[in-house]
């Protein structure tokens, strides 16, 4: 299992799920990120997530297959 973190910029309160997948190079494009999310492959805080623009905040945990990403401030 691969564990990773994403640190929010001091001026940001959140990052959208789709943007996180692109920044972490899990998805090659916005369209690819959308498909990953719509297919139900992403969990946020233990719940299956289908909202591509889900706002991720510090303390949230995103899981996709063998990848776990912790959001920090």
Protein language model regions, located:
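Short, charged beta-turn/beta-strand-edge "cap" motif at the junction between a beta-strand
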Residues: 66-71
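A basic, amphipathic helix-loop patch mediating RNA/tRNA/ribosome contacts
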Residues: 12-55
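Structural signature of FAD isoalloxazine-binding scaffolds in flavoprotein oxidoreductases
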Residues: 63
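A detector for short, charged/polar N-terminal pre-domain segments
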Residues: 2-13
């Amino acid at each position: 299992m691969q564990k990773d973190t994403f640190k929010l910029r001091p001026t940001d309160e959140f990052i959208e799920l789709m943007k996180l997948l692109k920044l972490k190079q899990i998805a090659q494009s916005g369209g690819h990120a959308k498909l990953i999310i719509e297919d139900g492959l992403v969990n946020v805080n233990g719940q299956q997530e289908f909202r591509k623009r889900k706002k991720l905040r510090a303390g949230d945990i995103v899981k996709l297959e063998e990848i776990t990403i912790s959001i920090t401030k």
